[in-house]
Curated annotation (Swiss-Prot):
InterPro entries: E3_ligase_UBR-like_C (IPR044046), UBR1-like (IPR039164), UBR1-like_winged-helix (IPR055194), Znf_UBR (IPR003126)
Major location (coarse): cytoplasm
Naturally occurring in which organism (per UniProt): Saccharomyces cerevisiae (strain ATCC 204508 / S288c) (Baker's yeast)
Subunit composition and interactions: Interacts with MUB1, RPN4 and UBC2.
PROSITE patterns: ZF_UBR
Segments of this protein annotated with the region Disordered: 1203-1227
Family per similarity comment: Belongs to the E3 ubiquitin-protein ligase UBR1-like family.
EC number in record: 2.3.2.27
Protein name listed in UniProt: E3 ubiquitin-protein ligase UBR2
Gene name of this polypeptide: UBR2
Location(s) in or outside the cell: Cytoplasm
Miscellaneous remark of the record: Present with 49 molecules/cell in log phase SD medium.
Associated pathway: Protein modification; protein ubiquitination
Residues joined by cross-link Glycyl lysine isopeptide (Lys-Gly) (interchain with G-Cter in ubiquitin): 709
Length: 1872
């Protein structure tokens, strides 16, 4: 050991020797020693450290005995050295950019005033709304798993660099200085970092190489011996072990490392990695138990450690390798991935994780973190110096391939490329740091040496920097948490905003292909993909770095590399693949084999968008060729051939991968050509446009040549004069009397393709050549190119749109079902092409190109080609047959043909745009307008019908608010709605390309209805206005768009189509044809007149008088079956008369029609009223039938709503309902009428009236909270209650912005008791019995998950589907007393009658069922009464608790807030209680019990301190009704109030003594006077009474100082009065349910502004209602009478022992007998923004946890949803376990807020379901899973409703069972 001590002279030696010194046991003490050593080395050099003393610790006896571990136990020692002296306020990034990683569910902001590019986000910690006033900004939620980075402090991301410094934390707004020369002088820090990083890379590189060597040997072994027997197995095991034991890979180790290997005893271990565990933990535990033959507890400890650590766990450790290897094979047979590793390697892995943790603390927690980041960057940029001899570059070892990085991933350099340098040195001239400049020079030299043309291997090997080795090797080896910490460390390097950052980016660019290769090859854990996504944001979004990539060759080599990579499956990619990089760009023939390659195209798209050197980009020939070649590779993929005979047997969806990649390549190519819009040099701009156009046309014609084959060569002809046309097979067609040559191709017959890349490229070039980027092109570039001269060849201009037109026709044929036999794949491709994000680049480009041909080429030839492609030759020539197999298909195709013509003539967004931004805004405008139209839509509906690439754009919400008016939700269940602004409704076009056929019909109908309403005209006279576009097209390239409407080919097609419509009555075709004519009239009036009135040749003699388009339109006016188009036709003629008076319409019509009647064209009112009487009569009868049916349905619906309505209106708004739903008790008539109006009248089974037989209502009993107490030991609770008394607390105090100041929950010491809820529906007992018998057999045969306590008695209400486990009979008590009779002491004695027996048995059964559900056995009538009475009182208490949040001034109980079901339940239970009482009228038991226990003070003081007096109050009311109470009724109530007051005094005295009246914690308790200078008389009586009760709990030998008690006098008095008012309020509610109120007990006294007076006022109201003395008299009476007697009784020597026992018992049960809280009941406090949970969580855990966090809304505890609990045998999850065993709030339910998906999880029994969360977006959407990407904020009304109505209102069982029972009929009014 002495030699070892002497050998350690530096930190590297210490790290190397540590495994041996620590005996390969990595404990907390080992970690502490490591950190201590590293921290010591930070401040001192290696020579100044006593290494011998550090090593002696490891050899000491205390280390062996683990005494050091006991010292460290429970201490947070990792932060001691690095902790800042001052606590940082908010988000601190002084001197750097923020670059904070924002993860899913966090909120980010985009300000489009400060930055025009949506790439640059600002996190919510930095974004200050006050500094962006009047800016156009929007808040979004991070959706991508890799997250987004904050650009606060990054000048490049903003239009004005000063805008980068608007951080919420003012300290961060100091401009960044580039003078960093003084922050990197500490050589100790840099050298230490060099050592640490070198060691970390050494371990990971060797670990990776060793793992690959072992893996390859095992694979080779398994391939060589596929069929070996058991004997061979043993032999092979020994041979396999040799390379592991005698590992030759370790020869490169230095002596110290080799000595470690040569130890006699080598430990081996089996490990399982959490990320590779592909089985459930329960299965894993059972497998471990079975294989290792260990107790299940050991296996569960393994799985729990695996689950909690997110890391690697050792299952077994031994020196016997053969045994370990055999056990590992047993695990592998069970499909469990395990690893056999040396204990030494395991130690090193833990060591690397700890080193990473130390580096993380150094960068983020140290006081000098900024200087540390600069030092770390220098170390990272420098070359990796390996301490392994074989890895090290030296004069004798110049080519250590073992440790080099292959810059081309695993591929070889092809022979053609061997002479070419792929990676060029970097010339970064502005780097001021000399040290980094030297590192750059050295780096460039190594980069040059990496290219060795003469090398045999042809691998592009490079000896890289530490940064490069870490992102390639180390990231994958680290544990899950350490990976993320390393990502954060590297991210922090990019926050340093100086020129050296470019060098860091350059190093990433050089190894980009290698990282991409690893990401595709072995990234099962998605680590490399996340790494690339994050580094891509740090690098390629920076314009200066994006500019660097252009000249470096990065773009072209990445595209070429990606195309090679597409052909390989991930598992086929090895570290060194003996395959050279493909020379060119070639797509795989069958399918693309991996999808992860897509990430590089996303980075390339970012470069195209972010770069600011368009001239350099466009002039780079290599990039030009790469873009064109890669884009054109998609030309002839996915051939389509229509199936004509039978449906395809197998539907192949392999095309999806091509669509997946082509979308990104489209965006990349569009971004490349969009750079034209930024070019300011006219000559260069013209040159590049002509170059691109030439390439696009040449390649498009080549593609046409390959895809267009001649059908009949006899008719084909070629023109040898044109080289382009000479290669195309053409055919001569005669259509509409015009002969033209068209390309010989038939859509639907020949094979064709969806993708036409060169056609899209042509569109991109034409479009961007005429546009600027953010504003129109300047005047100097207006006429820089004349495209009319470029396209003088009309034939070429026609052929350029050939493929586009064929694709549009193909889509039309698919829409009409002509390709139906091709199955789902063809329709799905069409949908992807026309509906999703690809549409803007493909479908719109096709339309653009056809429009280009329409404007440029011969219109006659275009029409012939157009009709030929549609296959409508015969139709256009006047014969409506032979084109398609059947008439229906032909008509449908014609419909699509005309629709496309309309769209070609009206869809001019792309034709008239002047800039990229304008086109972007036009697209948004059109999509939003046509998503809304005339409807009122929610945000979700709008988003669902607009393509995702628009709705996911950050600025979508801004444009939505611009074009639509928003209305907030009205009720709790509503969403916010949008309505299109009136000024945009004129722009609605039913023929918009984005509308479906059904939607198009609705829009057209609504346009006409809107016109009818606005212009007060009949629907028949309305029409769809024609879109006027001629002014927009003027002076543009497309001014000749309507030229086809000037030729007879077009006119004859329209005329023949109209002939077919009239002859064959194709009335569905007419509206579109007429609209097409209307468009031509409006936009091309002069030229189209010759076509409109031209008399074409007569085809059929029957129509010889109508042979012009105009005359045929007139003829349509004579036909009633064309009435839908009459308004449109008259509008055409009206427009002609008004706009073109020189066109004499009347003259034309007289000449071309047989009998022209102007009254037909211009009808008078009399003419309009003249209709076919029979037709009108039938229409009238149809309307009557429809009206009658709708009236009947409406009546049924209203009846259902009246009987079953539950108010869901906004809680903050007073509820206005009919008396039938919420009867007020003040003006109620009688209880029976109230019940009748509250519930359904008929039996739910037989539908007969309830009075036909004994009637019972369905009810459900479950435990719920009936009371909650105060925790006086919690200062927060006491301060909050005091603020309640002082009036400082707001109404919505449950919501606050910063809940961290509170303990999270206000529910303490809850009392959970059985509560009833009736749904309001019932049945006859016989009908219910029959129903139960019928379902008994079904339940016996099914395995429904029904709680055992319910048995077979659990049913659903057939009407509302509510659960029912009990019933409440309707007793029809005709003797029910009123309140006046109660106070007048009018006795109504009723004897037991025989006719009550049938009802009696039902009532007793009902009571027995209630008792069974509580586990109480009902054997006597007295038991039955007690059970019903207790349920009644519990329901009263629960109701009062829920009503506290709806307090209304001037009212004791706000009865308006009680739902009809709740009132019905209380009445039914009360009547059941009273009815059972009548069964033992002659019994003296109850009255004597009350006299003994309650009225007798001596007994009450001993036994009555903990009884529920409400039970006896209810019992006393029944005694009074039976004449069993000798005292006056109101005196009984008065005495009961006294006894309750006594109970409260005892409880409060006990609890205040417990906390010593807060004498020692004044700083925490903020209790002050309420402002009254002179205490009232009632207060003095009250306080003096309380002081006497305090003496009961004071020890005799202690003298108590009452001065501290005086300071909280107001608080104590207020609390006592408020608590007494709770009991009074419940008594009042109990009284109003049992007695009909026929008077007004509310006397209106003058109100005081003082809050305390208001509280006294409430008690005074109750006292006055019960005709009792006022409160002052009550307190005075208690003070002078009961107080003296009670205290004397307690201090009486005879009963002293008994009294002491009472006091002792109260103290011992302090938690179960808590003082009642006067607060209204509510769930935990929630933050305003849901993303606050993500910010509060540790970001490391937030990223690493695979389970979503759910917050218990009862106690605030955080759980992991769907995470099984090990201690429960993995049979239930954390949430269920918490609800049953862990929650401190006793409840039958679990209520959890899922913070990641914004939903509520309701748990009940063994079931659970999801419910809408109280968090809504600003548009009123619940936005589950953040699917709309908008932040959600707490809705106070919804949260209150969740608490009061759902949780505490006993609705959870009904919701859970409704949503989890698949066989349940959800019912509804329509089933009645």
């Amino acid at each position: 050991m002495e030699d070892s001590d002497l050998s350690i002279t530096n930190i590297r030696d210490f790290l190397t020797e540590l495994p041996k010194l620590a005996k390969c046991e990595y404990s907390e003490t080992t970690s502490y020693l490591l950190w201590k050593t590293l921290n010591l080395r930070l401040k001192h050099s290696d020579n100044d450290i006593n290494w011998r003393s550090l090593v002696s610790i490891l050899n000491s006896e205390a280390w062996e005995n683990e005494k050091y571990r006991d010292i460290l136990n429970g201490r947070k020692w990792r932060t001691l050295e690095f902790e800042n002296d001052h606590h940082s306020v908010g988000n601190m990034h002084i001197g750097t950019a923020c670059t904070r990683l924002c993860f899913p569910s966090e909120t980010i902001y985009y300000c489009f005033t400060c930055s025009t590019n949506p790439l640059y986000e600002i996190c919510e910690l930095c974004f200050d709304k006050e500094k962006h006033v009047n800016h156009s900004y929007v808040a979004k939620v991070v959706m991508r798993p890799e997250g987004r980075i904050c650009h606060c402090g990054d000048p490049f991301a903003f239009n004005d660099p000063s805008d980068a410094f608007k951080c919420k934390n003012e300290l961060n707004n100091i401009p960044i200085s580039n003078d960093n020369s003084n922050v990197t002088d500490d050589e100790n820090v840099i050298s230490l970092l060099n050592y640490v990083l070198d060691f970390l890379i050494d371990v990971t590189v060797s670990y990776k190489e060793e793992a690959e060597a072992h893996s390859s040997e095992r694979k080779a072994s398994s391939l060589m011996h596929p069929n070996q027997n058991s004997i061979t197995d043993d032999i092979m095991e020994k041979h396999e072990c040799e390379p592991l034991v005698n590992d030759e890979n370790f020869v490169f180790f230095d002596n110290n490392w080799s000595n470690t290997r040569k130890e006699a005893h080598m430990e081996w271990a089996i490990q399982i990695e959490e990320e590779e565990c592909n089985v459930h933990y329960m299965d894993l535990a059972s497998t471990i138990t079975r294989i290792l033959n260990t107790p299940v507890e050991y296996a569960i400890s393994i799985t729990k450690a695996l689950e909690d650590s997110h890391d690697v766990v050792t299952v077994l450790q031994s020196e016997n390798f053969f045994e370990i290897d055999q056990i590992a094979k047993e695990f592998q047979k069970e499909n469990i991935v395990v690893h056999v590793r040396k204990a030494d390697d395991i130690f090193k892995r833990k060591l690397t994780d700890d080193l990473t943790d130390w580096l993380y603390s150094l960068c983020f927690k140290a006081a000098t973190s900024l200087q540390n980041k600069y030092a770390l960057r220098i170390s990272m940029l420098d070359v990796w110096y390996s301490h392994f001899s074989k890895m090290r570059v030296s004069p004798t070892n110049t080519n250590p391939d073992f440790s080099k990085i292959n810059l081309l991933g695993g591929f070889l350099i092809s022979n053609e490329d061997s002479d070419e340098s792929w990676f060029k040195p970097w010339s970064l001239e502005n780097i001021e740091d000399e040290r980094i400049s030297k590192i750059l020079t050295n780096y460039n030299e190594r980069l040059i040496r990496a290219h060795s043309p003469n090398t045999v291997s042809h691998f592009y090997n490079f000896y890289g920097s530490r940064f490069q080795y870490i992102i390639i090797n180390s990231i994958n080896i680290l544990s899950k948490k350490s990976k993320f910490k390393m990502l954060k460390i590297m991210a922090s390097l990019f926050s340093l905003r100086d020129e050296s950052r470019k060098f860091l980016a350059a190093q990433y660019i050089d190894v980009y292909l290698s990282v991409l290769y690893d990401a595709v090859a072995s990234d099962a854990k998605e680590c490399q993909v996340t790494l690339m996504s994050i580094l891509g944001q740090y690098t390629f979004q920076d314009p200066s770095i994006a500019n660097m990539t252009i000249s470096s060759g990065f773009i072209e080599r990445t595209i070429r590399f990606a195309f090679t990579l597409m052909a390989f499956n991930p598992e086929d990619l090895m570290s060194y693949l003996p395959i050279s990089l493909y020379n060119g760009f070639k797509l795989p023939t069958e399918t693309i084999r991996n999808r992860r390659t897509i990430i590089c195209f996303k980075d390339l798209c970012t470069i195209m968008s972010a770069n600011t050197v368009p001239e350099e980009l466009l002039s780079n020939e290599a990039i030009f060729n790469a873009i064109i070649e890669s884009f054109s590779e998609f030309s002839n993929v996915l051939p389509l051939k229509r199936e004509t005979k039978e449906h395809v047997e197998v539907e192949n969806f392999d095309f999806s991968a091509f669509y997946f990649f082509f979308s990104s390549i489209l965006i990349m190519t569009d971004g490349y050509t969009r750079s034209i819009s930024l070019v300011k040099d006219a000559a260069f701009r013209k040159q590049i446009v002509l170059k691109l156009l030439d390439v696009a046309q040449t390649r498009e014609f080549e593609s046409l040549t390959n895809s267009r084959k001649a059908i009949s060569p006899d008719n084909a002809s070629t023109n040898e004069n044109d080289s382009n046309k000479a290669t195309l097979s053409t055919v001569r067609e005669t259509i509409c009397n015009y002969v033209a040559e068209t390309i010989n191709f038939q859509v639907g017959v020949n094979t064709q393709y969806f993708f036409n890349p060169m056609s899209y490229l042509f569109k991109f070039v034409i479009q961007w050549s005429q546009c600027g980027r953010y504003e129109p092109i300047p005047a100097s570039l207006t006429n820089y190119i004349n495209l009319f001269e470029v396209f003088q060849d009309k034939q070429k201009a026609l052929y350029i749109s050939e493929s586009a037109l064929s694709t549009l026709v193909l889509i039309g044929q698919i829409n009409v079902g002509f390709w139906v036999r091709n199955g789902t794949p063809i329709t799905h491709q069409a949908r992807m092409y026309t509906k999703y994000s690809m549409r803007e680049f493909t479908y719109i480009s096709d339309i653009f190109n056809v429009q280009f041909s329409m404007a440029m080429c011969n219109p006659d030839e275009l029409m012939v080609t157009y009709l030929s492609r549609w296959g409508l030759k015969h139709w256009a020539n006047g014969v409506p047959m032979y084109d398609y197999p059947d008439t229906e298909t032909t008509v449908a195709v014609v419909n699509e043909c005309i629709l496309l013509l309309i769209q070609l003539l009206t869809e001019v967004r792309s034709l008239v745009m002047k800039s990229s931004k304008e086109g972007f805004e036009r697209t948004f405008k059109s999509e939003i307008i046509h998503a809304l139209c005339f409807d009122t839509c929610s945000y979700a509906q709008i988003v669902n019908c607009i393509p995702e690439h628009i709705t996911k754009h950050p600025s979508f919400d801004i444009y939505l608010e611009k074009y639509a008016n928003y209305t907030s939700p009205v009720s709790l269940t509503d969403n916010g709605i949008f309505v299109l602004k009136e000024k945009y409704k004129d722009e609605i076009d039913p023929y918009y390309i984005g509308l479906s056929s059904s939607r198009r019909y609705d829009v057209e109908k609504n346009i006409r209805l809107n016109m009818a309403n606005l212009k007060k005209m009949k629907y028949e006279d309305t029409f769809v206005p024609a879109k006027k576009v001629k002014d927009l097209l003027k002076n543009t390239l497309f001014s000749g768009l309507y030229s086809i409407s000037s030729v007879n080919t077009f006119g004859l097609f329209l005329k023949n189509t109209l002939d077919h419509i009239i002859k064959y009555d194709y009335d569905n075709l007419l509206p579109r044809v007429v609209h097409l004519i209307h468009l031509c009239v409006v936009n091309n009036l002069n030229e189209f007149m010759g076509i409109l009135w031209h008399e074409y040749a007569i085809v059929d003699t029957e129509f010889c008088h109508y042979h012009s388009i105009g005359s045929i339109l007139y003829y349509c006016l004579l036909k009633d079956n064309f009435s839908e188009s009459h308004g449109k036709i008259r509008e055409i003629f009206r427009y002609l008369m008004e706009t073109a008076p020189h066109v004499n319409v009347n003259s034309y019509l007289r000449e071309q029609t047989t009998s022209y009647t102007p009254g037909i064209l211009w009808p008078t009112k009399e003419d309009k009223s003249h209709k076919d009487k029979e037709f009108e009569r039938k229409k009238h009868l149809a309307r009557l039938r429809k009206k009658k049916l709708m009236k009947k349905l409406a009546q049924q619906q209203m009846k259902f709503m009246e009987n079953n309505s539950v108010d869901t209106s906004d809680i903050s708004t007073p509820r206005t309902t009919s008396p039938s739903l919420s009867p007020t008790r003040i003006n109620a008539e009688n209880s029976s009428n109230t019940i009748n109006s509250c519930c359904d009248d008929d039996c739910v089974f037989c539908k007969m009236p309830k009075d036909d037989d004994v009637f019972v209502y369905f009810s459900y009993q479950e435990r719920n909270i009936c009371d909650h107490g105060i925790d006086f030991t919690n200062p927060t609770d006491v301060n909050r209650i005091n603020s309640l008394f002082s009036g400082k607390q707001t109404k919505d105090s449950a919501i606050q912005e910063n809940p961290q100041d509170d303990d999270g929950t206000r529910l303490k010491f809850t009392s959970c008791e059985p509560v009833l809820r009736a749904c309001g529906h019932g049945s006859h007992t016989k009908c219910l019995s029959g129903h139960m018998k019928s379902i008994r057999g079904i339940q016996n045969q099914t395995t429904k998950n029904i709680p055992l306590s319910y048995g077979s008695g659990l049913i659903y209400c057939p009407v509302c589907n509510s659960l029912s486990n009990s019933f409440l009979p309707k007793t029809n008590d005709i003797d029910k007393r009123t309140s006046s009779q109660f106070f007048m002491c009018i006795e109504k004695r009723s004897e037991a009658e025989e006719n009550l027996d049938p009802m009696s048995s039902i009532c007793i059964k009902a009571a027995m069922i209630l008792g069974d559900l509580q586990g109480k056995k009902v054997t006597t009538i007295e038991d039955a009464y007690k059970v019903v009475n207790s349920v009644f009182i519990n329901t009263i208490s629960n109701t009062e608790l829920r009503l506290r949040s709806h307090k209304k001034e001037g009212k004791i109980v706000n009865m308006e807030r009680i739902s009809s079901q709740c009132i019905l339940t209380l009445h039914l239970v009360c009547e059941l209680k009273s009815f059972i009482y009548k069964k033992f009228v002659n019994s003296k038991t109850f009255s004597s019990e009350i006299s003994r226990k309650i009225w007798n003070w001596n007994e009450f003081l001993i036994k009555g301190n903990n009884v529920n007096l409400l039970l006896y109050m209810s019992q006393n009311f029944d005694n009074i009704d039976g004449g069993k109470t000798p005292q006056p009724p109101n005196l009984c109530i008065y005495e009961m109030f006294k006894r309750r007051f006594h109970q409260l005094l005892l409880l409060l005295a006990r609890d205040m003594m417990r906390v010593n009246f807060y004498k020692d914690c004044r700083n925490k308790i903020k209790i002050s006077s309420n402002g009254s200078e002179e205490p009232s008389t009632s207060f003095s009586y009250l306080f003096n009474t309380f002081k006497k009760y305090v003496d009961l709990f004071k020890p005799d030998d202690v003298r108590f100082d009452f001065t501290s008690l005086e300071k909280i006098k107001d608080f104590i008095c207020s609390l006592l009065l408020e608590s007494l008012s709770i009991f009074c309020r419940r008594t009042f509610l109990l009284f109003n349910i049992q007695y009909d109120d026929d008077g007004d007990g509310d006397n209106n006294n003058n109100r005081s502004n003082n809050f305390m007076d208001v509280k006294q006022r409430e008690i005074e109201l109750i006292f006055r209602y019960f005709k009792l003395p006022n409160l002052t008299h009550f307190l005075k009476d208690f003070f002078y009478n009961e107080l003296t007697q009670n205290i004397e009784r307690y201090n009486d020597g005879n009963d002293n022992l008994r009294i002491q026992q009472v006091i002792y018992d109260m103290v011992q049960n302090i938690n179960t007998r808590a003082y009642p809280s006067p607060e209204h009941i509510q769930l935990i406090e929630l933050p305003l923004n849901l993303s606050k949970f993500s910010l509060d969580n540790d970001e490391i855990s937030n990223k690493c946890d695979k389970y979503e966090i759910a917050v218990c809304l009862l106690c605030g505890q955080k759980c992991h949803i769907q995470k099984s609990i090990a201690l429960q045998g993995y049979l239930q999850g954390e949430c269920t376990d918490h609800m049953r065993n862990g929650c401190e709030i006793t409840s039958a339910y679990g209520v959890f807020l899922m913070t990641g998906t914004n939903a509520i999880y309701l748990s009940y029994g063994k079931r659970g379901t999801f419910y809408a969360a109280p968090y809504l977006s600003k548009y009123g959407e619940t936005n589950e899973d953040y699917k709309f990407g908008t932040p959600v904020y707490l809705n106070r009304a919804r949260y209150a409703n969740l608490a009061n109505e759902i949780v505490f209102g006993n609705m959870i069982p009904h919701i859970v069972f409704r949503l989890t029972d698949g066989s349940a009929d959800l019912g509804g009014w329509e089933t009645m």
